[in-house]
Amino acid sequence: MAVKIRLKRMGANKSPFYRVVVADSRAPRDGRFIEQIGYYNPVAKPEAEVKLNEELALKWLAEGAKPSDTVRNLFSKAGIMEKFHNAKLAK
């Protein structure tokens, strides 16, 4: 089973927010997911609101889950990708 870390769209019309979820790559964008690891609100003022569970994100990355491009950018800004690469190189 190929697992991806991606965004699940929630919210009202023209006022979206997203949950960062771990899901089977074959599942629909807003369909079934395995685990929720955070959320992302791009509409929040003055800047986008992001909350991520770092431990769960690192666990799923270590197990081979592939992040989408947007999630990879969110992880990079939060410093999660750097920690993952450092842990990978330390092995």
From Swiss-Prot:
Keywords associated with the record: Ribonucleoprotein, Ribosomal protein
Superkingdom per UniProt: Bacteria
Pfam families: Ribosomal_S16
Alphabetical list of InterPro entries matching this protein: Ribosomal_bS16, Ribosomal_bS16_CS, Ribosomal_bS16_dom_sf
GO terms classed as biological process: translation
Gene3D superfamilies in the cross-refs: 3.30.1320.10
GO cellular component, one term: cytoplasm
GO MF entry, a single one: structural constituent of ribosome
UniProt-listed SUPFAM superfamilies: Ribosomal protein S16
UniProt cross-references to NCBIfam families, sorted A to Z: S16
Family stated for the protein in its record: Belongs to the bacterial ribosomal protein bS16 family.
HAMAP family: Ribosomal_bS16 (MF_00385)
Protein name: Small ribosomal subunit protein bS16
Species the sequence originates in: Exiguobacterium sibiricum (strain DSM 17290 / CCUG 55495 / CIP 109462 / JCM 13490 / 255-15)
